[in-house]
């Protein structure tokens, strides 16, 4: 599955907001699949984009 597909799936299931979806689509081109997946998992649990990004960078890197 691609990064964009993962992001769209989370949005379609209403796990992330429209704003988070749009931001993640732009963000995906700069980061690895593992980074994006970690961010999506954290945002599904209620973390903000910025907090999820910091956690993903610390956890899996860029």
Mark where each language-model region is:
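Arg/Lys-rich, low-complexity, intrinsically disordered basic segments
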Residues: 1-62
